[in-house]
Each structure stands twice: as C-alpha cells, then as structure tokens.
C-alpha cells in the first residue's frame, strides 16, 4: 500500500487567486491572495455575527445575543483587572482584537481553509503595530519620564549601565514575542492535524480490517481537533491579556 504524503506546510502557502495588471503609474499588479481573502472574510464575519446578534428590538435576548454579551463581559473584566477601571477607553480595541484573532483561528479549522495567524507577516504585523502604539502612548503620557521604565526602581547607580541595555532589549523583544507566540502555537496545531490526517485518510480506504482498526486513532484525532478549537480561544485570550499588560506598563510605567 503506497502512501502519498504531501508536505504539511503546503497549507500555509500564500497563493494568488485573482490577479489584475493595470497600466497605471507605469505598471501596477493588483492581486487577491488567499491570505487577503480570509482576512476580509474574518472582518466580515466579526461584523456580521455582531449585527445578527443585535438585540435592540427584542425584549427577550436570543441565545446568540447572550453569548455575545457574555464575551463582552469577559473582555470587559479582563480590561478592568489588567488596565484599571479608569482606562476602559481601550475596551473597544481589545474586544475587536479578541474577536478578530478568534474568528481568524476558528475559520482556519474548516477543511481547506486558511488560517490568517499562520502568516508570520500578519502575526508580527499585529504585534509590531501594538508595540508602536503602546510606545507612542507612553511617550505622550509621560514625555521624557517614560525612559525611567528602563531603570527598575531601587537600582544602584553602579548597575544602571548594565541593567538599562537588558531592560531595553527586553522591551524591544515585545514587538516580536507577541506575534511569534501566536504564530508558533497556531501553526504547530495545524501541522499536527495535517500529518495525522495524511496518515488516517489512506488507512480508511484500505482493507476492511484496517479501516475498523483506524476508528480508534480517528477518535483520538477528533479529540485533537477539539483541542485545536480550544487553542483558538486560548490564543486569542492570551494575546489580549499580554496586550493589556503592555498598555498597563505604558500607562503606569510599572
């Protein structure tokens, strides 16, 4: 029995779906890739789910409306505990960020789908944008005093030249660590599912006895799919927790 195993990394390849060449400003090539398509679909799904869950004209809320309100309450509690009640102006941003990452991760679990977070450019782009925004916020609030963040309180004067570069490197690493964490966790799960599915599919099309014996590994595989769905929620939540932590550092210089 021959096994045809494709690379588990093929699912992360960014391919052009529609390409358009325009003779504007010399030569312009416009193309819609699978990454761009699923990013647009993610934004559309986030908006559509909230519009459908709107409960403005109903006295009794629907189950979907209750689920959205519960999600909002959870994110609100996160922002309140991490940043403080006085800084709830950042709640819309954190809430939008949570649902964008969540829907992007969940849509990638659909067969033949594409996970936006498995693009290192998107993940690093998100973390870089947050890092730059948080840094600008800290400079706007504290001016020159913002640089005291790189000198831990109570540090002896003799250790300042040693600790400042360490703190600076640690701070700059945030621009990448946030995105790399999301990228690595989501990518690892999809690679594992691709490898297991590549082995199980030929076994099911084999002899009757082998097909029956494959039921148990398939049940385990189904459990891994459920675990990957849970990871979609966890990674969205962890990303928002760390973003709130960075916002708190910029606001309070802790």
From Swiss-Prot:
Belongs to the ATPase A chain family. The gene is ATP6. Residues 1-6 form a propeptide. It is found in: Mitochondrion inner membrane. It is a multi-pass membrane protein. GO terms for biological process: proton motive force-driven ATP synthesis. Pfam families: ATP-synt_A. GO terms for molecular function: proton transmembrane transporter activity. Keywords: ATP synthesis, CF(0), Hydrogen ion transport, Ion transport, Membrane, Mitochondrion, Mitochondrion inner membrane, Transmembrane, Transmembrane helix, Transport. F-type ATPases have 2 components, CF(1) - the catalytic core - and CF(0) - the membrane proton channel. CF(1) has five subunits: alpha(3), beta(3), gamma(1), delta(1), epsilon(1). CF(0) has three main subunits: a, b and c. It comes from Mycosarcoma maydis (Corn smut fungus). This is ATP synthase subunit a. Mitochondrial membrane ATP synthase (F(1)F(0) ATP synthase or Complex V) produces ATP from ADP in the presence of a proton gradient across the membrane which is generated by electron transport complexes of the respiratory chain. F-type ATPases consist of two structural domains, F(1) - containing the extramembraneous catalytic core and F(0) - containing the membrane proton channel, linked together by a central stalk and a peripheral stalk. During catalysis, ATP synthesis in the catalytic domain of F(1) is coupled via a rotary mechanism of the central stalk subunits to proton translocation. The chain crosses the membrane at residues 32-52, 83-103, 119-139, 146-166, 182-202, 207-227, 228-248. GO terms for cellular component: mitochondrial inner membrane; proton-transporting ATP synthase complex. NCBIfam families: ATP_synt_6_or_A, PRK05815.2-4.
């Amino acid at each position: 029995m021959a096994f045809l195993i494709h690379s588990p990394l093929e699912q992360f390849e960014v391919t052009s779906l529609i390409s358009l060449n325009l003779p504007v400003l010399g030569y312009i090539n416009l193309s819609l890739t699978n990454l761009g398509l699923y990013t647009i679909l993610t934004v559309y799904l986030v908006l559509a789910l909230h519009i459908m869950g709107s409960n403005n004209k109903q006295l009794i809320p629907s189950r979907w409306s209750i689920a959205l309100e519960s999600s909002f309450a959870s994110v609100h509690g996160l922002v309140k505990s991490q940043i403080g009640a006085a800084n709830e102006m950042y709640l819309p941003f954190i809430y939008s960020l949570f649902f964008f990452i969540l829907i992007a991760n969940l849509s990638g679990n659909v067969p033949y789908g594409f996970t936006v977070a498995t693009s290192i450019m998107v993940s690093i782009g998100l973390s870089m944008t947050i890092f730059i925004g948080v840094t600008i916020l800290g400079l706007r609030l504290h001016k020159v005093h913002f640089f005291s963040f790189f000198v831990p309180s109570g540090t002896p004067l003799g250790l300042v030249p040693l600790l400042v570069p360490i703190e600076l490197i640690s701070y700059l690493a945030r621009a990448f660590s946030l995105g790399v964490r999301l990228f690595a966790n989501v990518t690892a799960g999809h690679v594992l599912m691709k490898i297991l599915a590549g082995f199980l599919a030929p076994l099911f099309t084999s002899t009757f006895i082998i097909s029956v014996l494959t039921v148990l590994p398939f049940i385990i595989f189904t459990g891994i799919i459920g675990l990957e769905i849970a990871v979609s929620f966890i990674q969205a939540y962890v990303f928002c927790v760390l973003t709130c932590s960075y916002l708190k550092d910029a606001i309070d210089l802790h």
